[in-house]
Amino acid sequence: VREHSIEVLLPFLQVCAGDAPLHVVPVCVGTGQAPVLRTAGQRLARVLERCRSRDGQRPLLLVSSDMNHYEDQRTTLRKDDLALDAALKGDADALLATVAREGISMCGAAPLALAFYALHAWSPDAAVRATLVMHETSAAVSHDTGHVVGYAGLRIFSC
């Protein structure tokens, strides 16, 4: 597996933590199969609960992903919107189905689905939702609208 998101995220996490201890458990996801991810999410929820019970603080789940890759601006925004619609509802099954059906090259769809499954298992009576912080494409910087990558920031919570 050539996963590199932890290498990208770790420096940001270290800056945010400052002098406080930082405990990180990277999880690499190698499948997009919903049944496997659902089971892994249930197991991850048990780990998260044990982490919380030790110090009283809730652990943070952080998922890194680009959105659609290397299509034109219009196509990328359309595909991103389809994936984001499912993500904003906290619906792992819909996210995975949409990405597969629409041919969306979102590299972190499976890790995001895993996080949704884990949150649903961790708090079964709570609704899992997300809010969009920002959505943009690489064209905002490169001005090349022919081949863009989509980026989105989501804040995900259970309530």
Q: What are the residue ranges of the model-derived segments?
A:
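Residue-level marker for buried hydrophobic side chains located in beta-strands
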Residues: L61-V63
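Flexible, D/E/H-enriched segments
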Residues: V1-P59, Y70-C159
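Active-site metal-binding loops of divalent metal-dependent hydrolases
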Residues: M67
